[in-house]
Amino acid sequence: ALGCNYVIPVVMKGQTGADRILTGTPLIEGDKPVRTNSDYWSVLPKDYVLYCVKYMNPWHASYLRRGIDKITENGTVTTSERHAQSVEKDEVCGITTRSLNTAVFPISTTSTNGTTVNCDLLLTFNDDNECTITSGTTGISATGSGKFVEDGEKNSWGNKDRDAIYLEYDVDFGFKQIATKDTLVLQTRGTNKLEVFAPKYKAN
């Protein structure tokens, strides 16, 4: 599941260093209602945890981004290089899971009136970690390709080899066309990020 749809329930059966486990008080004495159904408890039980299971594909992570943009706007072509003095200071961007083999890479540009225009690039990978790039945003077209390379960036930040994604793509925003070459150096997988959710009980 890509969202908070499935959980692993864990119930506490014993304790050490505490007086007791807070098992709650049902509205009806002697009743044993479902723990997650708050309507049947006068004091909610605190003796369980719901661990959510959520799928993240291999490319889901935060990356350090650098590259070159060739921008065509109103017939004028300019080139913009994005590259900090050190990799650690490059732009931080995120790639998230869309499906088993597809990841979402959000990019943006500025329109002629100064507003920000966003586009979700869809990176669809094959078994060789090569990807095709398309647009997931209505009204904006994109084409391109790329590749994920394990330890592709040698002696990168922290003096260690780092995984990387190399992308080359063209995006047509309508008012502006951008041809981009990107290098995305893995920063963190983000698997230790705390996410909380509020479960809702639904009777069958």
Describe each model-derived feature in a short phrase.
Residues 3-204:
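Intrinsically disordered, low-complexity regulatory regions in eukaryotic proteins
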